[in-house]
Curated annotation (Swiss-Prot):
Lineage of source species: Eukaryota, Metazoa, Ecdysozoa, Arthropoda, Chelicerata
Name this protein carries in UniProt: U7-theraphotoxin-Hhn1j
Disulfide bond among keywords: yes
GO terms for cellular component: extracellular region
Single Gene Ontology MF annotation: ion channel inhibitor activity
Similarity field: Belongs to the neurotoxin 10 (Hwtx-1) family. 13 (Hntx-13) subfamily.
Keyword terms: Disulfide bond, Ion channel impairing toxin, Knottin, Secreted, Signal, Toxin
Disulfide bonds: 51-65, 58-70, 64-81
Task performed by this protein: Ion channel inhibitor.
Propeptide: 20-50
Organism name: Cyriopagopus hainanus
Length: 90
């Protein structure tokens, strides 16, 4: 009887150690994934755009892309880039 109880307690201790190890590994993987996402976001933010895209706010110092034109829309308080009914050449 004592051997059976000792075996059960020992098995529970082993399972507790294994689950703690898996949890620590999962947290480390989650942290690595979060760091990777932040690095990708930082890299994309540092890229300078040459022109403003569709529905983007535009001014003289922020030109629209070639297939867009800067127009004032009465529902919006600033100028936006809208389609000029042409297609960009590829």
């Amino acid at each position: 009887m004592k051997t059976a109880i000792f075996t059960v307690v020992l098995a529970l201790a082993v399972f507790a150690v294994l689950s703690f190890g898996w949890e620590a590994n999962e947290k480390a993987l989650s942290e690595e994934f979060t760091e990777l996402i932040h690095e990708k976001e930082a890299a994309s933010e540092t890229e300078a755009r040459e022109c403003r895209y569709f529905w983007g706010e535009c001014h003289d110092h922020m030109p629209c892309c070639d297939w867009l034109v800067c127009r004032y829309k009465w529902l919006i308080t600033y100028n936006i880039c809208v389609w000029n009914r042409t297609f960009p050449e590829k």
